């Protein structure tokens, strides 16, 4: 990848950084020679006891999820994947977070370190692989949502979390206005809510955590239990 960037720099030729191209509908249309990152893939380091995983940019999110699942762990931000081939690099570059965003945080919040090829062909490392990395400005998190404008992400270290022991989805009948008021109220209380959506008629909630806390929250909130695949 460094060689391709340096060749483009010498020509000069604009580059279009691309993994699975599953998020091409985002942002403006770009032109340039395609630099495909999918061959630069694989898990570099993973120690479940440290809750940190390091992967190359072309690693499919499905592969990352499978490795984490084997250790009963997961990505905290639950990023949306527009296709089975969506990559780790694309997840960071686009900075999209899933339904856990209001409760767990964004993709940016869990980036510990990155390796990046700059527009001048330099392969730099920012951040590290620990949470308490406070030396200097946290440039690694700038890469989240940068859409490749700050450089080509080649490697990223992410904080991960243990999977919840229990998950339950419920449906509560109420209009949008009521749902917004309830969510604002519940957001100030220790409820194990990890996702919410409104379909026009009902508020759907996902509860995750220990068996006791999920059962207690369900007893308090009520609602119809939804199919586990919801």
Regions found by a protein language model. Name each.
Residues 93, 112-230:
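C-terminal substrate-binding/cap subdomain adjacent to the FAD-binding core in PCMH-type
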Residues 1-17, 37-84, 92, 96-129, ...:
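N-terminal glycine-rich flavin-associated loop
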Residues 24-29:
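Short glycine-biased active-site loop of nucleotidyltransferases that positions the nucleotide triphosphate
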Residues 31-35:
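Short, well-ordered secondary-structure micro-motifs within conserved domains or adaptor modules
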Residues 21:
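Short, basic/aromatic recognition patches that contact phosphate-bearing ligands
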């Amino acid at each position: 990848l460094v060689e391709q960037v340096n060749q483009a720099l010498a020509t000069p030729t604009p580059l279009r950084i691309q993994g699975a191209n599953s998020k091409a509908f985002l942002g403006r249309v770009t032109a340039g020679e395609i630099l495909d990152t999918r061959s630069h893939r694989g898990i570099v380091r993973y120690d479940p006891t440290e809750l940190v995983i390091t992967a190359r940019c072309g690693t499919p999110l499905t592969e990352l999820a499978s490795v984490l699942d084997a250790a009963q762990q997961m990505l905290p931000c639950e990023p949306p994947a527009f296709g089975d081939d969506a990559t780790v690099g694309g997840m960071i570059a686009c900075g999209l977070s899933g339904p856990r965003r209001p409760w767990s945080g964004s993709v940016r919040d869990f980036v510990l370190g990155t390796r990046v090829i700059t527009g001048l062909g330099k392969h730099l490392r920012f951040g590290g692989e620990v949470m308490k990395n406070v030396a200097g400005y946290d440039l690694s998190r700038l890469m989240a949502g940068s859409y490749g404008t700050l450089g080509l992400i080649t490697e990223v270290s992410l904080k991960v979390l243990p999977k919840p022991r229990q998950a339950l989805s419920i449906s509560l009948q109420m209009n949008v206005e009521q749902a917004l008021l309830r969510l604002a109220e519940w957001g100030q209380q220790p409820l194990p809510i990890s996702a919410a959506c409104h379909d026009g008629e009902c508020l759907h909630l996902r509860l995750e955590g220990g068996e006791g806390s999920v059962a207690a929250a369900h007893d308090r909130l009520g609602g119809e239990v939804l199919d586990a695949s919801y």
